[in-house]
Amino acid sequence: MSDIIFLNGMRFYGYHGALHAENELGQIFIVDVTLKVDLTEAGKTDNVKDTVHYGEVFEDVKNIVEGPSCQLIEHLAERIAKRI
């Protein structure tokens, strides 16, 4: 069984882009993440260890977006996908 968790509208300030101004001035990035997971065990046990910690996912995405700059948004998205 698969469940889907949506974390939508996460806003972070980052310095990504191919243009010098994007890296110098930065901008707001709005990130949506969709996680496909099996939460069957969490539903049975009521134990937080059996689920996804939304706060940790948020912090992981925040650290990536607010971290070292990327020229391409595609590269930034790949870094997020690999981490979560």
Swiss-Prot record:
Pfam families with a match to the protein in the record: FolB
Signal peptide start and end residues: none
Amino-acid positions noted as binding substrate in the UniProt annotation, renumbered to this chain: E22, Y54, I73, E74
Cited SMART domains: FolB
GO biological process: folic acid biosynthetic process; tetrahydrofolate biosynthetic process
EC number: 4.1.2.25, 5.1.99.8
Organism domain of life: Bacteria
InterPro entries referenced in this protein's UniProt entry, alphabetically: Dihydroneopterin_aldolase (IPR006156), FolB_dom (IPR006157), GTP-CH-I_C/QueF (IPR043133)
Reaction(s) this enzyme catalyzes, per UniProt: 7,8-dihydroneopterin = 6-hydroxymethyl-7,8-dihydropterin + glycolaldehyde; 7,8-dihydroneopterin = 7,8-dihydromonapterin
Pathway assigned to this chain's UniProt record: Cofactor biosynthesis; tetrahydrofolate biosynthesis; 2-amino-4-hydroxy-6-hydroxymethyl-7,8-dihydropteridine diphosphate from 7,8-dihydroneopterin triphosphate: step 3/4
Keywords: Folate biosynthesis, Isomerase, Lyase
Entry keyword annotation includes Protease: no
GO molecular function, one term: isomerase activity
Listed GO CC annotations: cytoplasm
Function: Catalyzes the conversion of 7,8-dihydroneopterin to 6-hydroxymethyl-7,8-dihydropterin. Can also catalyze the epimerization of carbon 2' of dihydroneopterin to dihydromonapterin.
Entry similarity comment: Belongs to the DHNA family.
Protein name: Dihydroneopterin aldolase
Gene source species: Staphylococcus haemolyticus
